[in-house]
Amino acid sequence: MGPRIVSSEVWRAERLALLAEEKPLDRARDALSEWRRALPATAVTQTYLFATETGPATLADLFGGRRQLVVYHFMYGADWAQGCPSCSFWADNFDGIGVHLAHRDTSLVAVSIAPLAKLLAYRDRMGWGFPWVSSAGTRFNQDFGVTMPEDEPVPEYNYAPRPGATGELPGISVFLLDQGRVLHSYSTYARGLDMLNGAYHFLDLTPLGRQEADLPWSMAWVRRHDQY
């Protein structure tokens, strides 16, 4: 079924009605962001050693001399042949923003549990340029809730019990470097990652939208960008 066809006067009236609803949502989003920024932080006392292109690095090293670090927990299991398709969809939105983040004293790094060689080979295949490091041999993924512990009867994901959850799951964690201390300020998972996918938000502006309602699951249509 196509859209209703109306006069420009009717279209303008309906657009203004929608705008009246959009503006409070914008203000609510701003207030939520302010609340997020005001959250307290916890000190990261565990030592993690990541494998990077330039050698072993601590979590503090991943800041790259900046005060803030955003970690994208990219799903790539140690024995996987390829990275997760949906994480790859998200990562397609990351390239090109690094220089802008740097000018706000912020670094963006992807972290996965797979060996570094696999990550870099897959990054080359995808044509990405953002930093990607391996947390293999550390508890980083488990501690930040994206690798489900095998010995836990009911694992937790997104701050709630997730019966049956196994392996790797996606997330974002945010850190602040304060007087040499690494502080954890925020993590989000599942639909909380939606705000980071620009492609979805472009689709949300269109009459057809995401076109996912009739699919077996929402992202059943998603492929790695070299597999469409």
Question: Where does each model-flagged region fall?
Answer:
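Non-globular targeting/processing and membrane-anchoring segments
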Residues: 1-104, 121-127, 131, 138-228
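Short loop/edge segments at beta-strand edges and connector loops
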Residues: 112, 134-136
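Catalytic nucleophile loop
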Residues: 102-119
